[in-house]
């Protein structure tokens, strides 16, 4: 056993966990929160709710939005502070610094916003689990693909352990979601999507109700209902699947969440889950080349050069 541990540590020491894979994931997660704050004024996302007379609720709460006076002018100021931090995260500046700030912003949003889709909760958990990776990341930009100089064995061990904990957490999340659904008769008999479509808060709008009515009101409704369960089971099983299957599972999983975004309006949640799934289903020590984007930028630059000549 000790020999296996030694071999694992040796393999980790030869690999690099600080790549643009986790950089892309945290940028996408931050982008979702950034869009939420840019689009919505505090008066829309921080207000009294059922059972809460004043908002944000700050009893035993360390949220950023609870550090000042409870009025919308102060809350709006804090909103812009969060926006500034999230912009730094999205562009990838100093993960070692912005990693902690990103978690605190995510925690503050999860604690203070009136949300119904669970995206902020997922972001708060994931940014916390990313802390051991960000705090040991020596790069100035999390997009950098340059080799890391120097021997950083302890930092690499810490980062890889955190990565595997994240993968287990994501797998458990989908496993728990599947089990919870299977405890409800609507999911077992295949009619759950029909009820979701009719739900007034996050149900289909008039366009999608008309578009999907032939399926949702027919026996074929079992296809999207059981299909959702099947995809979630596959995502959980990806924890044990060979890496060669990860990309296909990632495409299927992200596609499922984007359907949720379009049809149910779960845009914030779906963007956050896309970032989490990239982290879950892409080897952290690999490098995303962004070949198409580089080619596009190069062609534009080359064309400008031709014009100037």
Swiss-Prot record:
TM spans (from-to): 28-48, 73-93, 113-133, 157-177, 220-240, 259-279
InterPro entries: HTTM-like, Sporulation_SdpB, Sporulation_signal_mat
Major location category of this protein: membrane
Claim: Acetylation is one of the keywords in the record: no
Protein's membrane topology: Multi-pass membrane protein
Domain of life: Bacteria
Protein name: Uncharacterized protein YitO
Lineage: Bacteria, Bacillati, Bacillota, Bacilli, Bacillales
